[in-house]
Amino acid sequence: MKITSLHFLIFHKNLNYVSSKVKAKKIFYQRALNNIYLCTIRTMIVDIAEIKKRDNHALDTQESQELVNKIKEIKNSDEQNNSNNNNNNSSSSNFCSNNNSPFSHKETKLMVKEEVPNSIVKNILNNNSCATSIINNKFYTQINNIIPVKPEAMKEENINVSTVNTENDISKEKKENSHYFCDEIKVMKKEYSKDDFVTDVKLEMNDKEEEEEEKQKIGQESTHINIKVEKDTFNECNNSNVNEKKRNRSVDIHNELSNKRILTEDVVVKCNIKNDVKIIVTWNMNSITVRYKNKKKWDEFMNFFNNLNADVLCFQEVRLPAMNLSEPCDNKNKNKNKNDGIRDRGKIKNSDQKSLADYEIMEQILNDDFKDYNAYFSLANIKYSGQLVLVKKNIHIESIRYNLFFENNAHIHHDEGRVILVEFSNFFLLSTYTPNNGFDHVKFERRRLFDEQLQKFVTILRNEKQKPLVWTGDLNIAPEDIDLSHPAEFRRMKKGNVPKEFIGQPGCTDFERKNFQKILTAGNLVDSYRYLQNIKLNEDKKNNIKHTPNINDNIYTWRCPFLLGKSCNKAMRIDHFIVSKEFLNRINKIHIQGFSVFHNNFYGSDHCPVILYLKNE
């Protein structure tokens, strides 16, 4: 017995308008009934309710190609219409529709299995990136750069798919009164590249006996379907790609269709890509746009970056303003850009001439220099603080969080963009730009609150999550005197009358060191660089090898930017990789890139990159 057709149409949805769903339905659903297409998109819609629309035949090769071409036509037409209707500068408009753009909210979207009231579903349809936060924080990541390809040169691959029975058409009255459900769709692969693509789908029903057994296993009326999926291989692949082992893929589709349908316009595809993170870089850039404008220094950095081939880059102090979502309350207020108006901290501001210049610089950086990476921003209101995390597109991310709380509010950013938590398959990566302790009581209190929140956060992470933590970034702490170039001078610095625990250069006071040790204890964490250095020193002692620390050695991550004056030549190690103790066996080495009082390999910043190399699991 044959099931005549089953189709999940996945298509581009530009964030500039909402009508594309309705428009695309009318065009595609008449014939696209027995195919799965994964298009070159970032935001996708999967409408499971359309399963009920059936045809009596599968599309042949020619019809399949016609459908792909039609999808491309509509996508290009929609993008052109949006560009014409947009009031912004043409360059920024085009960039917003770019699939690689972080400005179209390239954050992990969430999908739920609980009942979702109709009012929230409407919010999701109309508000795109923000509305999903209303529901809860079950995270499912986006799938990027999956390309529709020609149906020639196909290779067959068997895939088992389980689904539940399809009901008759849902009446209009039921639709209006019912709740909607978001169920899970998984695309699981050991490796992933844009060469992989799912096309023609053929369905066959099992015998009745097997069907009854399947019903008992699942505990509900269901149909087990075997799907034969054809996979394209590009003729233009490199020889190395041609000789690669076949990638294993399994697709698990399990949606209850009785009074249920997927209506979210966020990604509901979870892509498990078995690529381990091997190299992580952290760097306080001290303004990414300023670094870029110094062509010589930027070229030096890009040469270092290209040779390194890092999997993850954590940039602190990028100094980009967050995008305005509303006008300030008081237009006469001179400080309105600092305090007023609602912001989207995951996007860059481009509403005035000054911010547009930085916006266009970032467009060029991300589309040219970091085109193989997904970008995750967390920004302050003004050109201050802020972070950017770049993750290779072939690395699977399970979730993203932008604060130090574990309520259902992962989308809410720290108001200065100081926290980004990325969950990978086998560990958490926390990047922070920890507040500087400063020299006054206001900043002392700000640092105390941040450290307290961080201590609670790592405690919960240790007790409730079953993954180790890698905490990196500009932590603004030199844990020991050995991390200071001039310990005596650093430790006696102060401004005004302050308690003894606050005496010292920010980053090395007793107050900060005490709180830092509390965080390490609470999270069962270790300063991995110092741990490895101590092992090396002990081995050298056994071999009678003596080391005399030198100001020019690559043992400090921050150096005073002034080459003259009383502060010149001073340096500290305040950028770190702090890891869970059980993660120490994964560390191969840690390298501090910068050296010398002349700031070699600092690439124009007052901080240098620090690189963590991980072993294979």
From Swiss-Prot:
GO MF terms held by the record: DNA-(apurinic or apyrimidinic site) endonuclease activity; double-stranded DNA 3'-5' DNA exonuclease activity; endonuclease activity; metal ion binding; phosphoric diester hydrolase activity; RNA exonuclease activity
Active-site residue list: H607 (proton acceptor)
Protein family: Belongs to the DNA repair enzymes AP/ExoA family.
Top-level EC class as recorded in UniProt: hydrolase
Biological processes, Gene Ontology terms: base-excision repair; DNA repair; nucleotide-excision repair
CC terms in the record's Gene Ontology section: mitochondrion; nucleus
Lineage, top ranks: Eukaryota, Sar, Alveolata, Apicomplexa, Aconoidasida
Protein name, entry field: DNA-(apurinic or apyrimidinic site) endonuclease
Compositionally biased tracts (Basic and acidic residues): 329-349
Chemical reaction(s) catalysed: Exonucleolytic cleavage in the 3'- to 5'-direction to yield nucleoside 5'-phosphates
Intracellular or extracellular location(s): Mitochondrion
UniProt EC number: 3.1.11.2
Stretches with biased composition (Low complexity): 81-99
Bound cofactor: record note: Probably binds two magnesium or manganese ions per subunit.
Cysteine-cysteine disulfides: none
Function field: Multifunctional protein that plays a central role in mitochondrial DNA base excision repair (BER) pathway induced by oxidative stress. Has apurinic/apyrimidinic (AP) endonuclease activity towards double-stranded DNA (dsDNA). Has nucleotide incision repair (NIR) activity; acts on dsDNA with oxidized bases thymine glycol and 5,6-dihydro-2'-deoxyuridine. Has 3'-5' exonuclease; can use dsDNA templates with 3'-OH termini including blunt-end, gapped and mismatched 3'-recessed.
pH dependence: Optimum pH is 6-8.5 for apurinic/apyrimidinic (AP) endonuclease activity. Optimum pH is 8-8.5 for 3'-5' exonuclease activity. Optimum pH is 8-8.5 for nucleotide incision repair (NIR) cleavage activity.
